[in-house]
Regions:
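Short beta-strand-to-loop acidic/aromatic patch adjacent to the donor-nucleotide binding site
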Residues: 1-4
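Catalytic core of tubulin tyrosine ligase-like
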Residues: 6-10, 15-188
Length: 188
């Protein structure tokens, strides 16, 4: 995710993923009150990521303790096998890959959200149009019984998402800004 700051190739996280034997390992961070988008939940006895769109009431996500950072560690060959593909298929047949993706997509829910699309024109003028957006969410892979998934709680520094300007001050003051600057080689 472009708005997840602090994600990096961490040898400890990679090692934990490899030792787990899971196809997918999702990093989660402790949730803060302003985090939106879903988190770790138990649904019908299975631990999974439950996005805000999938929850019956908007306020339900406030009860989740861990937030989805959108960072996922993946075992490529088992994931391809789940899709009915091999590495060779990726460069050999666009049609086969597209069919495999569509087949997997049919197993997952589709969410419809209403968003505002803005068309700016003139000096300070804009038109706002409501549009329907159809979404499939990567985190819904955690709901599929044949996909072995794990979850790794990581420091907030590794998985904090900035979706709103109001989140900049807490990000700058909790050490996340310095952590990200070090990752990017910008630390003073």
């Amino acid at each position: 995710n472009i708005d997840t700051l602090g994600a990096s190739l961490d040898p400890d996280a990679l090692g934990a993923h490899l030792v787990s034997g899971n196809i997918l390992t999702f990093e989660v961070v402790p949730r803060r009150i302003y985090d939106r988008g879903g988190g770790l939940a138990r649904v019908n006895g299975r631990v999974r990521l439950l996005e805000g769109l999938a929850q019956p009431r908007e306020e339900d996500e406030l009860n989740l303790r861990y937030y989805n950072s959108q960072t996922t560690w993946i075992q490529i060959d088992p994931l391809l096998q789940l899709f009915g593909l091999t590495r060779a298929d990726l460069s050999a047949s666009d049609t086969k890959v597209a069919e495999a993706v569509r087949r997997m997509g049919r197993r997952m829910p589709t969410y419809v959200t209403i968003k505002d699309a803005k068309r700016r024109w003139g000096h300070g003028q804009e038109d706002v149009y409501p549009v329907a957006q159809f979404e499939k969410l990567w985190s819904d892979m955690t709901a599929l019984a044949d996909v072995s998934c794990g979850f790794l709680v990581v420091p907030r520094l590794r998985g904090q998402q900035l979706k709103d300007l109001n989140q900049l001050d807490p990000w700058a003051n909790d050490g996340s800004k310095e952590y990200t600057a070090r990752l990017c080689g910008l630390a003073r």
